[in-house]
Curated annotation (Swiss-Prot):
The keyword Nuclease applies. It comes from the Archaea. GO terms for molecular function: endonuclease activity; metal ion binding. It comes from Halobacterium salinarum (strain ATCC 700922 / JCM 11081 / NRC-1). The gene is pelA. This is Protein pelota homolog.
Amino acid sequence: MQLKDRHTVEGGRERITLVPESLDDLWHLAYVLEPGDFVAGDTHRRIQRNDDQMRDTGGEREHMFVTIDVGDVEFHKFSNRLRVSGTIEDCSREDQLGLHHTLNVAEREELEVEKHWQPDQLNRLNEAVEATDQPDVAIATVEEGEAHIHVVQQYGVDEQGSFTATTGKGEQNDRGRDELFGTLADALARMQADAIILAGPGFTKQDALDHITEEYPDLQETITMVDTSAVGGRGVHEVLKRGAVEDVQEETRIAEESELIDELTTQMATDGKAAYGIDEVQKAVEFGAVEDLLILDERLRLERAGEGDWVDVDVNDLVRTVEQQGGSVTVFSHEFAPGEQLRNLGGIGAVLRYRLD
């Protein structure tokens, strides 16, 4: 993410000009933007003139710069788009003011965002800026007969490929093994990841490593091996829990979330220093007992938009109070397993400085 300009405007709002540079950046924006914000950018809009209406031609598409009063935001990771919908607040044609329009924001397209920024939202932008310099990490998990490739993103982990083959003893099965390792090697080479974690149970991953580095010697210095008891999604979770990603990526959102949710559930299991659900967490905040506040991005956005079910709770005040008391706040991605765990706990939890009872 590039932040190109930033200044205060009327009403205490702040306008930031930025350029999303990756799918991760678009995902960050999806959880920063909310109804009532103003988003401005270049777009094309179909304009229907009187003669067009008579002929029912649908009008001509015109390029214009528009400002949208945001009503809805949708992140479409499979089409690499962020859709920002709302009414036109400002543009070069007065006859279009107040009409509905959707900005399709893509990577490397400059836009302006004007809003009342919350501290965690600014932190999220700064995180996206810093992440630009972090390496791309692929996690390959392999055992006899199957291999999987996942890519670590800031919004979660995406599975990029899954391969199977008949392996075992015998010449035919040896051929299947070579084909599996060859397919895995080809896929990893095409990805051009900055770092690769090769994981799995037993000695199969060592055989896979030998095959990969024989075919693609340049990959050897990018590969780190990690022992896990499983492959696929479970194997990836083990890799993250063990901090292997942090060894090659100085800071990763997912590893931090995995560590925090594990700490929370451990404290819950031992009847220790933990709170979950809005009622318990709100009580802990009132006592100044929150060391780490965990909150789900979806829940935070719903509550800020007034569409949630936390009665008489100002979520911005809650977050601000924790920070003023010296606690940390982590906004979890709903796209990954730790976020799913947090959702099952009501979308909010806290690791405490001390027990409340």
